[in-house]
């Protein structure tokens, strides 16, 4: 996938009227949590250029491991993550 594609996926989820952002989560690499990953509802983030924000916290897009739906379907996954990686 090309660079910046995850931002395009998130933009579609947040701004396309056919999508409901409450149905989606992002999984990020988050040092200090169990397993170093954290699941965050897409409705809680604000998109920026090169970063996304959770309230006042700025997080780079490269920390996103996956975009998933509530039902567990993987919408986007970072290149290099095997199928055995569970979110």
Curated annotation (Swiss-Prot):
A family per Pfam: MJ1316
Signal peptide annotation: none
Superkingdom classification of source: Archaea
Protein family according to the UniProt entry: Belongs to the UPF0248 family.
HAMAP family: UPF0248
Protein name listed in UniProt: UPF0248 protein TSIB_1445
């Amino acid at each position: 996938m090309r660079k910046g594609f995850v931002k395009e996926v998130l933009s579609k989820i947040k701004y396309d009227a056919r999508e409901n952002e409450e149905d989606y989560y992002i999984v990020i690499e988050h040092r200090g949590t169990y397993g170093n990953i954290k699941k965050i509802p897409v409705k809680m983030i604000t998109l920026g250029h090169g970063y996304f924000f959770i309230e006042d916290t700025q997080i780079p897009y490269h920390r996103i491991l996956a975009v998933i739906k509530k039902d567990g379907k993987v919408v986007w996954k970072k290149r290099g993550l095997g199928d055995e990686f569970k979110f």
